[in-house]
Amino acid sequence: MNIVITGCSKGIGAELVKLWSQDNMVFGISRDIISLKKIQKNLKRPSNFKFIAEDITKLTVNQLNTWISVDSIDVLINNAGFLINKEFEKINYDDYKKVMDINFWGSFRITQLLIQKLSVVNGHIVNISSMGGVNFSSKFPGLSLYSSSKGALTILSECLAEELKSYNISVNTLALGAVQTEMLNKAFPSYKAPTSAKEMAEYIISFCESSNKILNGQIIKVSKSNP
Protein backbone atom coordinates (compact mmCIF):
# COMPACT_ATOMS: atom_id res chain seq x y z
CA MET A 1 0.00 0.00 0.00
CA ASN A 2 0.89 3.66 -0.38
CA ILE A 3 0.29 5.67 2.79
CA VAL A 4 0.56 9.39 3.58
CA ILE A 5 1.05 10.48 7.19
CA THR A 6 1.14 14.08 8.35
CA GLY A 7 2.83 15.03 11.61
CA CYS A 8 5.11 12.00 11.58
CA SER A 9 8.29 13.18 13.30
CA LYS A 10 7.25 12.29 16.86
CA GLY A 11 4.74 10.37 18.92
CA ILE A 12 2.00 8.39 17.22
CA GLY A 13 3.01 9.58 13.75
CA ALA A 14 6.58 8.34 14.16
CA GLU A 15 5.34 4.97 15.41
CA LEU A 16 3.03 4.69 12.41
CA VAL A 17 6.00 5.21 10.10
CA LYS A 18 8.08 2.56 11.87
CA LEU A 19 5.34 -0.06 11.72
CA TRP A 20 3.81 0.63 8.31
CA SER A 21 7.10 1.04 6.42
CA GLN A 22 8.06 -2.57 7.08
CA ASP A 23 5.79 -3.72 4.25
CA ASN A 24 4.40 -0.53 2.65
CA MET A 25 5.51 2.72 1.05
CA VAL A 26 5.06 5.60 3.48
CA PHE A 27 5.12 9.29 2.58
CA GLY A 28 5.58 11.55 5.59
CA ILE A 29 5.47 15.28 6.16
CA SER A 30 6.72 17.30 9.12
CA ARG A 31 8.73 20.47 9.64
CA ASP A 32 11.29 18.67 11.83
CA ILE A 33 13.87 17.44 9.33
CA ILE A 34 16.29 16.24 12.04
CA SER A 35 13.69 13.88 13.51
CA LEU A 36 12.59 12.72 10.05
CA LYS A 37 16.16 11.79 9.10
CA LYS A 38 16.67 9.99 12.41
CA ILE A 39 13.49 7.96 11.91
CA GLN A 40 14.48 7.00 8.38
CA LYS A 41 18.00 5.99 9.43
CA ASN A 42 16.64 3.56 12.04
CA LEU A 43 13.99 1.91 9.87
CA LYS A 44 14.30 -1.72 8.80
CA ARG A 45 13.59 -0.59 5.23
CA PRO A 46 14.62 3.06 4.93
CA SER A 47 13.75 3.19 1.23
CA ASN A 48 10.09 2.65 2.15
CA PHE A 49 9.90 6.08 3.79
CA LYS A 50 9.97 9.20 1.64
CA PHE A 51 9.55 12.44 3.54
CA ILE A 52 9.32 16.15 2.96
CA ALA A 53 10.29 18.68 5.63
CA GLU A 54 7.74 21.39 5.00
CA ASP A 55 4.98 23.37 6.66
CA ILE A 56 1.86 21.44 5.68
CA THR A 57 -0.16 24.64 5.41
CA LYS A 58 2.17 25.97 2.69
CA LEU A 59 2.58 22.81 0.60
CA THR A 60 2.30 23.50 -3.14
CA VAL A 61 1.07 21.20 -5.89
CA ASN A 62 4.56 20.97 -7.37
CA GLN A 63 6.07 20.07 -4.01
CA LEU A 64 3.44 17.40 -3.46
CA ASN A 65 3.96 15.82 -6.88
CA THR A 66 7.72 15.69 -6.35
CA TRP A 67 7.33 14.20 -2.88
CA ILE A 68 4.54 11.72 -3.74
CA SER A 69 5.55 10.31 -7.11
CA VAL A 70 3.06 7.42 -7.16
CA ASP A 71 -0.30 7.53 -8.95
CA SER A 72 -2.44 6.26 -6.08
CA ILE A 73 -2.71 6.60 -2.30
CA ASP A 74 -4.49 3.96 -0.24
CA VAL A 75 -4.55 5.73 3.13
CA LEU A 76 -4.19 9.34 4.25
CA ILE A 77 -3.65 9.89 7.97
CA ASN A 78 -4.19 13.50 8.99
CA ASN A 79 -2.23 13.31 12.22
CA ALA A 80 -0.47 16.69 12.37
CA GLY A 81 -1.32 18.52 15.55
CA PHE A 82 -0.24 21.43 17.69
CA LEU A 83 -1.32 22.33 21.21
CA ILE A 84 -1.20 25.57 23.15
CA ASN A 85 -2.10 25.25 26.83
CA LYS A 86 -3.25 28.75 27.72
CA GLU A 87 -6.07 30.38 29.64
CA PHE A 88 -8.91 31.47 27.37
CA GLU A 89 -8.65 35.18 28.15
CA LYS A 90 -4.95 35.20 27.27
CA ILE A 91 -5.24 33.58 23.83
CA ASN A 92 -4.36 35.93 20.98
CA TYR A 93 -4.80 35.84 17.21
CA ASP A 94 -1.32 34.42 16.60
CA ASP A 95 -2.13 31.50 18.92
CA TYR A 96 -5.43 30.96 17.11
CA LYS A 97 -3.86 31.04 13.66
CA LYS A 98 -1.04 28.64 14.49
CA VAL A 99 -3.30 26.05 16.08
CA MET A 100 -6.04 26.28 13.44
CA ASP A 101 -3.54 26.26 10.57
CA ILE A 102 -1.92 23.04 11.71
CA ASN A 103 -4.87 21.20 13.24
CA PHE A 104 -7.52 22.15 10.68
CA TRP A 105 -6.32 23.95 7.56
CA GLY A 106 -3.34 21.63 7.01
CA SER A 107 -5.62 18.59 6.96
CA PHE A 108 -8.11 20.44 4.76
CA ARG A 109 -5.44 21.40 2.23
CA ILE A 110 -3.58 18.10 1.90
CA THR A 111 -6.89 16.28 1.52
CA GLN A 112 -7.76 18.59 -1.38
CA LEU A 113 -4.40 17.89 -3.01
CA LEU A 114 -4.70 14.09 -2.69
CA ILE A 115 -8.32 13.50 -3.72
CA GLN A 116 -7.43 12.27 -7.20
CA LYS A 117 -4.74 9.88 -5.96
CA LEU A 118 -7.07 8.52 -3.28
CA SER A 119 -9.93 8.01 -5.73
CA VAL A 120 -7.87 5.61 -7.87
CA VAL A 121 -8.01 2.87 -5.22
CA ASN A 122 -11.11 3.69 -3.14
CA GLY A 123 -8.86 5.31 -0.57
CA HIS A 124 -9.40 5.82 3.13
CA ILE A 125 -8.92 9.15 4.92
CA VAL A 126 -8.55 8.93 8.68
CA ASN A 127 -8.52 12.20 10.59
CA ILE A 128 -6.93 12.03 14.03
CA SER A 129 -9.06 14.11 16.34
CA SER A 130 -9.31 14.17 20.12
CA MET A 131 -11.81 13.35 22.82
CA GLY A 132 -11.69 17.07 23.50
CA GLY A 133 -13.03 17.69 20.00
CA VAL A 134 -16.23 15.65 20.21
CA ASN A 135 -19.52 16.04 22.06
CA PHE A 136 -20.26 14.60 25.50
CA SER A 137 -16.65 14.31 26.66
CA SER A 138 -14.70 16.01 29.42
CA LYS A 139 -13.19 19.40 28.59
CA PHE A 140 -10.26 21.01 30.38
CA PRO A 141 -9.11 24.54 31.24
CA GLY A 142 -6.39 25.87 28.97
CA LEU A 143 -7.34 23.65 26.04
CA SER A 144 -10.23 25.63 24.54
CA LEU A 145 -8.30 26.47 21.38
CA TYR A 146 -6.93 22.96 20.84
CA SER A 147 -10.30 21.31 21.46
CA SER A 148 -12.07 23.77 19.16
CA SER A 149 -9.62 23.07 16.35
CA LYS A 150 -10.13 19.33 16.73
CA GLY A 151 -13.88 19.87 16.78
CA ALA A 152 -13.58 21.64 13.44
CA LEU A 153 -11.62 18.68 12.06
CA THR A 154 -14.27 16.27 13.32
CA ILE A 155 -17.05 18.16 11.53
CA LEU A 156 -14.94 18.40 8.37
CA SER A 157 -14.68 14.60 8.40
CA GLU A 158 -18.44 14.21 8.48
CA CYS A 159 -18.84 16.68 5.61
CA LEU A 160 -16.20 14.98 3.48
CA ALA A 161 -17.67 11.54 4.11
CA GLU A 162 -20.70 12.73 2.13
CA GLU A 163 -18.96 14.94 -0.40
CA LEU A 164 -16.30 12.39 -1.39
CA LYS A 165 -18.70 9.48 -1.86
CA SER A 166 -18.66 10.15 -5.59
CA TYR A 167 -14.90 9.49 -5.53
CA ASN A 168 -15.39 6.21 -3.62
CA ILE A 169 -13.29 7.61 -0.77
CA SER A 170 -14.15 6.74 2.84
CA VAL A 171 -13.57 9.33 5.58
CA ASN A 172 -13.56 8.46 9.27
CA THR A 173 -12.42 10.11 12.49
CA LEU A 174 -10.57 8.64 15.44
CA ALA A 175 -11.07 10.76 18.55
CA LEU A 176 -8.15 9.77 20.74
CA GLY A 177 -8.02 9.88 24.50
CA ALA A 178 -4.83 10.09 26.53
CA VAL A 179 -1.72 8.70 24.81
CA GLN A 180 1.77 9.05 26.28
CA THR A 181 3.34 11.63 23.95
CA GLU A 182 5.11 14.99 24.16
CA MET A 183 1.81 16.71 23.41
CA LEU A 184 0.14 15.03 26.38
CA ASN A 185 3.01 16.17 28.59
CA LYS A 186 2.38 19.74 27.47
CA ALA A 187 -1.32 19.50 28.33
CA PHE A 188 -1.04 17.42 31.51
CA PRO A 189 2.59 17.50 32.72
CA SER A 190 2.19 15.13 35.68
CA TYR A 191 -0.18 12.64 34.06
CA LYS A 192 0.83 9.13 32.97
CA ALA A 193 -1.35 7.82 30.15
CA PRO A 194 -2.42 4.16 30.08
CA THR A 195 -1.73 3.89 26.33
CA SER A 196 1.65 4.22 24.61
CA ALA A 197 2.18 5.83 21.22
CA LYS A 198 3.11 2.44 19.75
CA GLU A 199 -0.05 0.79 21.09
CA MET A 200 -2.20 3.51 19.58
CA ALA A 201 -0.33 3.28 16.27
CA GLU A 202 -1.02 -0.46 16.13
CA TYR A 203 -4.73 0.20 16.63
CA ILE A 204 -4.80 2.94 13.98
CA ILE A 205 -3.12 0.67 11.42
CA SER A 206 -5.63 -2.11 12.06
CA PHE A 207 -8.51 0.34 11.74
CA CYS A 208 -7.20 1.92 8.54
CA GLU A 209 -6.56 -1.34 6.74
CA SER A 210 -10.01 -2.82 7.29
CA SER A 211 -12.65 -0.28 8.24
CA ASN A 212 -13.02 1.63 4.96
CA LYS A 213 -14.87 -1.38 3.53
CA ILE A 214 -17.67 -1.09 6.09
CA LEU A 215 -17.44 2.38 7.69
CA ASN A 216 -17.78 5.92 6.38
CA GLY A 217 -18.45 9.17 8.20
CA GLN A 218 -17.95 7.62 11.62
CA ILE A 219 -16.48 9.23 14.73
CA ILE A 220 -14.82 6.52 16.79
CA LYS A 221 -13.85 7.33 20.37
CA VAL A 222 -10.58 5.54 21.16
CA SER A 223 -9.91 6.10 24.82
CA LYS A 224 -9.11 4.33 28.06
CA SER A 225 -8.97 7.67 29.84
CA ASN A 226 -9.58 11.34 29.13
CA PRO A 227 -7.03 12.29 30.15
Predicted feature residues:
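Substrate-binding pocket helix/loop in short-chain dehydrogenase/reductase
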Residues: E87-F88, D95-K97
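C-terminal helical subdomain
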Residues: T173, P189-P227
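Conserved NAD(P)H cofactor-binding loop of Rossmann-fold oxidoreductase domains
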Residues: N79-N85
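Conserved glycine-rich Rossmann-like NAD(P)H-binding loop of the short-chain dehydrogenase/reductase
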Residues: D23-K38
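Conserved glycine-rich cofactor-binding loop
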Residues: S9-K10
